[in-house]
Amino acid sequence: MKRLNTLVLYISFLILIISIVAGCGTGKEAEIKKSFEKTLSMYPIKNLEDLYDKEGYRDDEFDKNDKGTWTISSEMAIQKKGEALNIKGMVLKLNRNTRSAKGFYYVNAIKKDENGRPQDKQIEYPVKMIDNKIIPTKDIKDEKIKKEIENFKFFAQYGNFKDLTKYKGGDISYNPEAPIYSAKYQLTNDDYNVKQLRKRYDIPTNKAPKLLLKGSGNLDGSSIGYKKIEFTFVEKKGENTYFTANLHFKPSNDE
């Protein structure tokens, strides 16, 4: 009987520990979602010039007269089996002090040389934004590139995370020392954002992606940090397909 009671106590204790750990994981997942909602609730930002009037979190790094700068980026990377990793994307900085935006569109093809070292061949095309339109600041002879810039849309302009709270069972990671945190979810091809990506990019796989929400800074938003979104369709040696997007607020550099 003693042995049975001891076993029952041990099992009860084990169940309690598992419940506490699971509860902590669920609580941290909710905190991470809440942290991202502060940024993702702005999506879709159809007119990027609206960011000139949106305030982000300010800490003591900001000068009192600095209204801050929003940096927005989107990038698609595709590597078919045995080929180079082809990357196309854009970065745009929207300065709230000057109400002006400039950045660059870029293309890159990364392949390894005979010694296995990656060779980076990124080409950048400077751009600016006027009346919510992206315009090259230098003459571009390549008509295909010109068209890509003309038609480019940032993920923040069409992405929608109104159903973020419905994502369940995420793989949660949290390091309070850094602090950095992330939540990863397996999506389906019926997900709204997945459909939008397939509509805009020639994605060479029917596999549904995993969504990674990765951030830095205090979870309660009381510090400056980044918020990164990544959709990974394929991830293996010599073959990759992923999309990344970012939107963050930081002090301006008006030099």
Curated annotation (Swiss-Prot):
Which compartment or compartments is the protein found in?
Cell membrane
Q: Where is the lipid attached (N-palmitoyl cysteine)?
A: 24
InterPro entries in UniProt: Csa, Csa_sf
Q: Which UniProt keywords apply?
A: Cell membrane, Lipoprotein, Membrane, Palmitate, Signal
The main place the protein resides is membrane
Identify the Pfam families for this entry.
Answer: DUF576 (PF04507)
Task: Tell me the leader sequence span.
Answer: 1-23
One GO cellular component this record assigns the protein to is: plasma membrane
Its membrane topology, per UniProt?
Answer: Lipid-anchor
Q: Where is the lipid attached (S-diacylglycerol cysteine)?
A: 24
Domain of life of the organism encoding this protein: Bacteria
Similarity remark: Belongs to the staphylococcal tandem lipoprotein family.
Q: Which NCBIfam families does its entry note? A: SA_tandem_lipo
Q: What is this protein called?
A: Uncharacterized lipoprotein SA0094
